[in-house]
Amino acid sequence: MRMRRKPWARPELEACDFFVANPKENKGNWKNTFKNTENPIYLELGCGKGTFMAVHGSDNPNINYIAIDIKDEVLVLAKRSIEKAYEEKNKALDNVKLMPQEIALIDTILDSNDKIERIYINFCNPWPKDRHKKRRLTHTRQLTKYRDFLVDGGEIHFKTDDDELFEESLEYFKECNFEITYITRDLHNSGYEYNVVTEHEEMFSKQGIKIKFLIAKKL
């Protein structure tokens, strides 16, 4: 279902202190955009309505986060979710940057100087048709780009409801010299402790769909 255009979304975002309207300007220098420049930087690709980032950011003030999505109409909901979480926990909102970006062009805003230590990919489009598979966020074409700015030993945390995407992604990671250090095909019964349930995850779980999850380490 396509989200209706919200003409008020961009003005609200531009009035937000942690929104970055032109992320290309910070390529290679992201650490200096945060208050604590010594914190490691984690990246969420496709933050959606911000449920995941709101919890992670407010629970981990010692980590800096970059959260991206493509639509203002989605980003403005993420902004509100993040603000609410920090307000409820009485935390200073100084470790999150929210921005619009096409993930296929992620290499236009990040490079090896940015030293990203972890990437989160949650419930991305599975692109099931063969002619579209190169658009997958876990495809080798994308993983090659991530390797440029992900530190050696850095991790990609990947969650999906889609069986085919998950199994084929295992091959993508192998091809791009990542080691799978954790894997489960039933996350909610796995005993994995620090799982933040996203809006999509909750929906799929209620339908009885098992959630697949892995951690891949850059070698």
From Swiss-Prot:
Keywords: Methyltransferase, S-adenosyl-L-methionine, Transferase, tRNA processing. InterPro entries: SAM-dependent_MTases_sf, tRNA_(Gua-N-7)_MeTrfase_Trmb, tRNA_methyltr_TrmB_bact. It is an enzyme of class 2 (transferase). Substrate binds at residues 129, 161. PROSITE patterns: SAM_MT_TRMB. Pathway: tRNA modification; N(7)-methylguanine-tRNA biosynthesis. S-adenosyl-L-methionine binds at residues 44, 69, 102, 125. It catalyses: guanosine(46) in tRNA + S-adenosyl-L-methionine = N(7)-methylguanosine(46) in tRNA + S-adenosyl-L-homocysteine. The keyword Ubl conjugation does not apply. Catalyzes the formation of N(7)-methylguanine at position 46 (m7G46) in tRNA. HAMAP family: tRNA_methyltr_TrmB. Belongs to the class I-like SAM-binding methyltransferase superfamily. TrmB family. NCBIfam families: PRK00121.2-2, tRNA (guanosine(46)-N7)-methyltransferase TrmB. This is tRNA (guanine-N(7)-)-methyltransferase. It comes from Clostridium perfringens (strain 13 / Type A). The lineage of its organism: Bacteria, Bacillati, Bacillota, Clostridia, Eubacteriales.
